[in-house]
């Protein structure tokens, strides 16, 4: 989703209005880089006002001549229609029945390359490709063919495209209004490597002779050369330098997130200067690295909860007053603001309040495909929600992820997005005070799903050996049950926290979480925590003697 450019923000501010753009983060793990041989990828869809169900496209057969209407994924604007494929596959969320998974982040790039007359936007490319592809390579072919045939009506995009055996990163841009074409390049991520992208083009130079691991448009270089954007030899061509050269915002708000994600598993300190964005001569960071340990699903979930902890970019250490009294690792937006005519900015971490949904997709080649693909899904900021398991063969959605009559402006306690958001929005301003309670429940749920996974899948395989549909039905029921249990637990959590932290106090509980009472049946005396010491010192430094209690003479 769309990258925030500093120049764009300044231009919009001068016009007197500000529109907050979208932004996302992706993390990718090759099968030899994971603890169990899974290919994994993650995606957080971050956009203010975004409300997203767990989408579902049932498998289907289509008659010759049947057409599919294309609506823009961001705006819901009608673009046109394309012929349906003879057969389409089951899709739940961003994974299909063959375990193919696609995510994205938008970097924008050169505005003149957008084809406003094209039919296919980036979101439509994703979901049409999922319905038509059995492998990542096939998805790349479907997406690029659609863009070239019907036109690409979006800005520059980075796609994560994975299956149980391979992980790919592809970048695409249109060729301008009326072009009905796209330039693109796709690279296979080494099996032993990890990769990340976050709204800044990441592909630089690539080996055009490596036909096994590199795919690209025939005119990927010549098109840039024809526009005067590149003048060197083909071997020296850099995608991002030609089509989306990194600027300060692209590095500090976007590449810094990719830097932080990779930093969980590899020493990225040599590239800190690049992430900080201020030194034009800083060393660019690699597209992928080999991790210093094998990566698990739980690890990837934690990556998506990152706030630059333990790094110079941290927004979680209370080192400035931006986080408020209780050290909230979130900041208000827009990212840029002015004081006395000077431009300032907030950090933009991976975990952010405007997340509509987030997933970690786990794809495994050694299991029957109906069992091998697990789409770990959460309907809010990853830090503030538990990821429930959704199997790729699922054909029935939990009510909490598909609640009738509920959307971005209609609330329901039956809906996961709204229940998670009402809880997280209560916690944000009192983060250090309240978050430990939320985290305890979140981690308990996450760990319970991991603990149950082997047993659930063993039973599913036993059923599969007798009747594959019985296994699918079982996994459907399990996925629905866990999602609905999560919703019930989160509603309980919200009610508990309203009582426990009412009026900025803490009501005492016993080891079982039951509120203590006096011998006479009243609530026990609450604790009044006051200011955290760090904030109290900041307040005194800022206010001087204003609140100093005078010493009284005895």
Features from the language model and the residues they span:
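Glycine-rich, aromatic-lined ligand/substrate-binding cores of catalytic
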Residues: 225-374, 378
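Hydrophobic core
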Residues: 10-17
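Sec/Tat signal peptide C-region and signal peptidase I cleavage site
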Residues: 17-23
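A contiguous strand-loop segment
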Residues: 24-122, 142-295
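Bacterial N-terminal signal peptides that target proteins for export
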Residues: 1-8
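Substrate-recognition/cap regions that form aromatic- and gly/pro-loop-enriched pockets
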Residues: 325-463
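Histidine-centered catalytic/metal-binding microenvironments
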Residues: 443-554
């Amino acid at each position: 989703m769309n990258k925030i450019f500093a120049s764009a923000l300044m231009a919009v501010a001068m016009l007197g209005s500000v529109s907050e753009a979208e932004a996302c983060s992706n993390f990718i793990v090759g099968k030899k880089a994971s603890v169990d041989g899974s290919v994994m990828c993650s995606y957080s869809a971050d956009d203010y006002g975004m409300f997203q169900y767990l989408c579902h496209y049932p498998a289907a057969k289509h008659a010759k001549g049947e057409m599919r209407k294309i609506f823009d994924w961001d705006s819901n604007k009608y673009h046109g229609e394309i012929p349906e494929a003879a057969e389409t596959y089951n899709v739940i969320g961003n994974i299909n029945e063959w375990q193919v998974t696609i995510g994205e982040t938008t970097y924008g790039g050169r505005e003149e390359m957008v084809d406003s007359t094209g039919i296919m936007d980036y979101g439509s490319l994703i979901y049409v490709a999922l319905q038509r592809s059995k492998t990542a390579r096939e998805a790349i072919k479907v997406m690029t063919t659609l863009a070239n045939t019907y036109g690409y009506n979006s800005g520059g995009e980075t796609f994560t495209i994975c299956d149980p055996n391979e992980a790919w990163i592809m970048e695409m841009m249109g060729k301008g209004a009326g072009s009905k074409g796209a330039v693109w390049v796709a690279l296979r991520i080494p099996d032993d490597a990890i990769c990340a992208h976050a709204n800044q083009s990441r592909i630089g130079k690539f080996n055009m002779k490596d036909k096994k691991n590199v795919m690209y448009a025939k005119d990927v270089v010549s098109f840039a050369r024809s526009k005067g954007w590149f003048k060197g030899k083909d071997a020296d061509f850099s995608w991002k330098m030609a089509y989306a050269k990194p600027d300060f915002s692209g590095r500090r708000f976007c590449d810094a997130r990719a830097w932080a994600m990779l930093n969980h598993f590899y020493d990225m300190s040599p590239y800190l200067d690049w992430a900080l964005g201020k030194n034009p001569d800083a060393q660019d960071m690699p597209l992928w690295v080999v991790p210093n340990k094998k990566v698990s699903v739980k690890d990837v979930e934690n990556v998506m909860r990152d706030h630059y902890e333990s790094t110079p970019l941290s927004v979680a250490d209370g080192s400035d007053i931006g986080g408020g009294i209780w050290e909230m690792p979130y900041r208000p937006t827009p990212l840029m603001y002015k004081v006395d005519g000077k431009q300032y900015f907030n950090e933009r971490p991976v975990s952010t309040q405007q997340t509509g949904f987030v997933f970690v997709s786990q794809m495994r080649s050694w299991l029957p495909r109906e069992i091998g693909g697990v789409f770990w899904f959460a309907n809010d900021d990853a830090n503030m929600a538990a990821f429930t398991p959704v199997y790729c063969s699922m054909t029935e959605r939990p009510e909490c992820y598909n609640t009738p009559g509920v959307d971005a402006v209609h609330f329901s306690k039956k809906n996961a997005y709204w229940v998670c958001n009402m809880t997280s929005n209560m916690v944000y301003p009192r983060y250090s005070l309240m978050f430990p309670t939320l985290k305890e429940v979140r981690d308990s749920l996450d760990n319970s799903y991991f603990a149950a996974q082997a047993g659930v899948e063993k039973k599913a395989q036993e059923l599969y050996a007798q009747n594959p549909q019985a296994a699918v039905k079982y996994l459907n029921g399990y996925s629905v049950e866990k999602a609905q249990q999560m919703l019930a637990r989160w509603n309980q959590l919200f009610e508990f926290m309203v009582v426990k932290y009412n009026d900025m106090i803490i009501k005492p509980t016993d080891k079982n979480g039951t509120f203590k009472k006096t011998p006479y049946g009243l609530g026990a005396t609450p604790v009044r925590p006051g200011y955290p010491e760090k904030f109290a010192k900041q307040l005194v430094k800022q206010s001087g003697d204003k609140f100093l209690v005078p010493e009284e003479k005895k």
